[in-house]
Amino acid sequence: MRVTVLGAGDAFSSGGRRQSGYLVETQGKGLLLDCGTTTLLALKALGIPAERIDLIAISHLHGDHFGGLSFLFLEYIYEHPRTKPLLIAGPPGTEERVRALHSAMYRELAARGVPFPVSFYEFAPEQKETLDGVEFFPFRVPHQEKDISLGYRVRTDGKAILYSGDCGWNEGLITHSQGTDLFICECCYFSTQTNFHVSYPQIAEQRHRLGCKRLILSHIGREVLERMTEVAIECAYDGLVIDL
């Protein structure tokens, strides 16, 4: 399994980092975890064909996590015409929001539809599901007041990955990290404490309780970048490749 970090930054692209996107590749299968607005840019900068993506799993419906979908659609329509199916999964409301996004950005194009099969699947939190050969356990995390945000424990090709999405610190991260090969955890803040994002001191304090073989911090915010000399946990960067 290979995981490529397409974007390790926050919504503000702090430090010039791209927005969230992680390509998980196994034997003949490509899973994209989140699709921030810079995802297509990242793929092209890294020389990765967009057609490698078979399945997209969105953690929550904020622009820096799903706003790049319209640009992928354009790529698949004009630059590298796609014929194979594309499955887009996410929390409740995903299909409606993706269609609204595409219509807002390219109304006439959206009205014509795309010339390849697109299907949607909306996860029910805490219910295991297998999509296109990939096993998901989606769990709700604290990030939005009303809309559902998800973290994912993903298992495929004999490996397990935990992806926090955006969230405040919660016990689910401890529970679902047990026995995983990789945990990609958001770390937006250093000194700021909120219920909606993880701060570095929080995860440093809880590190010993995590059951992952490898922990990588991502969604790095300005506060963390300004104090990187104090960070003792591995941090993601745009273009990082992780072989498991």
Q: What is each of the regions a protein language model found here?
A:
Residues T37-T38, P142-E145, C167-N170, G221-E223:
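Short beta->alpha connector loops
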Residues P91, G165, S218:
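Glycine- and other small-residue-rich loops at beta-strand/loop junctions that grip anionic moieties
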